[in-house]
């Protein structure tokens, strides 16, 4: 009975939050109110409000405010500072004419490609490869928004389609050595090499190709439906005085991430890399004019871009975190796990149930890790008791958690991309919905075809 009540409360609040965001209310305010309401109800029900890693203040009421403080410090510090630095960097690149020079140079070879959607798919594959270097979905999305997004928009790709491309690369896990894959390999009782390279990677590649095709047709359909015209920017209208080599500057963060990864050079945080990139750009600006005042005034544009990012993106991330914690503390995720364990032992049925519940948990909490970490702990027990191959259950769940995050209006990557693109999170979700569902279907079908469903088939007994 308690499980039903927790689920009901979670669903009611989720529906209410979605309704008011769709009606045009501030997403930050709505998520804050929804999250605080859930935390208050959790406290009344006797649930612990703060994560287990945080010490209680001694009172539930102040614990709620304490959690907001924790999020402000964590998301306003590490992740938030990264987002603000990237937004400031993007604003500075526009100010000094580097983005204009990228468009001016790129327009010459790109004019031979008539379809902006082919360019969009090429950008999607590049973005997916970038996920090998940047493990954070939000970090990757923000990095792509600061680098690829302006280029895509300026060569004729709609803002919604370009935002969807930046939000969806991390929907499928491609990196064989990510923490999720290592944990999944353990739960599947397989070596990392066999699980990551021989089993998961082929399924991931198939899903990425399917999602790319879906992006092509879905974005084109939505653009036609919304009467969005595609016009290449007339390069003759670009009057930038920046030298041609400035075209490389917007991509220096990506180059830095690839170089300073601990293999080719020292492993540096992306914020450190961004500081280096900003210093290089400002030094070049000084060498062009030898005008210190002009350089300092230009950097003010970057600082204002950082401030705008705090108001439009970082605070939205904090509000989304409060909402996700509210769903977690009220027992919403644990209730979903209880439902999963109540189903029978038929392999395909159990796999589909786990996939659906993992997707639902990821959509509602906005986290790709938390639902998978919560569900994966019970995989060995479920598999052994049912005679099912653990990998048969783990692989679809692993991908479903990340796919579900891309459909969540409170996930960091969707919120950050929507904020930087200045569109609604629901517009991003609409744009990614069909490609994500296509990817999910491919993952399920490929798992059914490539991974043995029973433990006996694996052991040969």
Model-derived regions: residue spans:
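Membrane-interface alpha-helices at helix entry/exit sites of multi-pass transporters
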Residues: 104, 113-122, 153-166, 193-198, ...
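Hydrophobic alpha-helical transmembrane segments of multi-pass integral membrane proteins
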Residues: 82-85, 111-147, 316-320, 343-381, ...
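Long, contiguous bundles of hydrophobic transmembrane helices that form the permeation core
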Residues: 2-14, 18, 31-38, 42, ...
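Alpha-helical transmembrane segments and, especially, the helix-loop junctions at the ends
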Residues: 127-144, 149, 154-194, 211-215, ...
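Membrane-interfacial loop-to-helix junctions in multi-pass transporters
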Residues: 3-7, 73-80, 108-122, 155-161, ...
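Short amphipathic alpha-helical coupling elements at transmembrane boundaries
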Residues: 70, 101-111, 150-154, 297-308, ...
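Interfacial loop-to-helix junctions that mark the boundaries of transmembrane helices
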Residues: 1-5, 22-24, 53-58, 65-78, ...
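Core transmembrane alpha-helical segments of multi-pass membrane transporters/permeases
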Residues: 32, 52-100, 271, 275-334
């Amino acid at each position: 009975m308690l499980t039903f009540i927790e689920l009901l409360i979670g669903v009611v609040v989720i529906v209410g939050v979605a309704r008011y965001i769709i009606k045009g209310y501030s997403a930050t305010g709505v998520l804050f109110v929804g999250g605080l309401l859930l935390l208050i109800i959790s406290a009344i029900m006797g649930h612990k409000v703060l994560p287990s890693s945080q010490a209680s203040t001694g009172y539930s009421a102040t614990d709620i405010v304490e959690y907001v403080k924790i999020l402000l410090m964590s998301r306003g510090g590490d992740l938030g500072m990264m987002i603000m630095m990237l937004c400031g960097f993007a604003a500075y690149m526009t100010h000094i004419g580097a983005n204009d020079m990228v468009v001016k140079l790129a327009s010459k070879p790109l004019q031979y490609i008539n379809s902006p959607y082919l360019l969009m798919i090429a950008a999607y594959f590049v973005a997916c490869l970038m996920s090998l270097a940047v493990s954070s979905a939000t970090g990757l999305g923000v990095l792509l928004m600061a680098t690829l997004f302006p280029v895509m928009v300026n060569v004729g790709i709609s803002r919604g389609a370009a935002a969807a491309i930046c939000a969806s690369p991390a929907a499928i896990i491609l990196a064989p050595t990510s923490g999720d894959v290592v944990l999944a390999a353990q739960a599947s009782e397989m070596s990392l090499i066999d699980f990551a390279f021989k089993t998961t990677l082929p399924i991931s590649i198939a899903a990425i190709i399917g999602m790319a095709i879906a992006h092509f047709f879905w974005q084109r359909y939505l653009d036609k439906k919304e009467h969005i015209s595609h016009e290449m920017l007339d390069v003759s209208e670009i009057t930038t005085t920046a030298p041609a080599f400035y075209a490389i500057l917007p991509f220096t963060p990506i180059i830095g991430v690839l170089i300073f990864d601990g293999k080719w050079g020292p492993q540096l945080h992306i914020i450190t890399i961004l500081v280096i990139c900003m210093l290089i750009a400002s030094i070049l600006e000084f060498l062009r004019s030898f005008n210190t005042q002009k350089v300092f005034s230009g950097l003010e544009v970057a600082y204002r871009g950082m401030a705008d990012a705090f108001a439009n993106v970082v605070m939205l991330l904090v509000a989304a975190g409060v909402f996700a914690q509210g769903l977690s503390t009220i027992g919403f995720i644990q209730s979903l796990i209880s439902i999963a364990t109540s189903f029978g032992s038929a392999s395909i049925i159990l796999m589909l149930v786990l996939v659906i519940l993992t997707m639902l948990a990821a959509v509602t909490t906005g986290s790709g890790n938390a639902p998978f970490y919560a569900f994966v702990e019970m995989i060995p027990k479920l598999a052994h008791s049912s005679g099912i191959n653990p990998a048969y259950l783990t692989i679809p769940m692993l991908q479903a958690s990340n796919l579900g995050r891309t459909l969540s209006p409170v996930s960091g990557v969707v919120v950050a991309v929507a904020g930087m693109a200045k569109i609604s999170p629901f517009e991003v979700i609409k744009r990614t919905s069909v490609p994500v569902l296509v990817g999910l279907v491919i993952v399920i079908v490929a798992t059914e075809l490539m991974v043995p469903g029973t433990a006996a088939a694996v052991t040969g007994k």
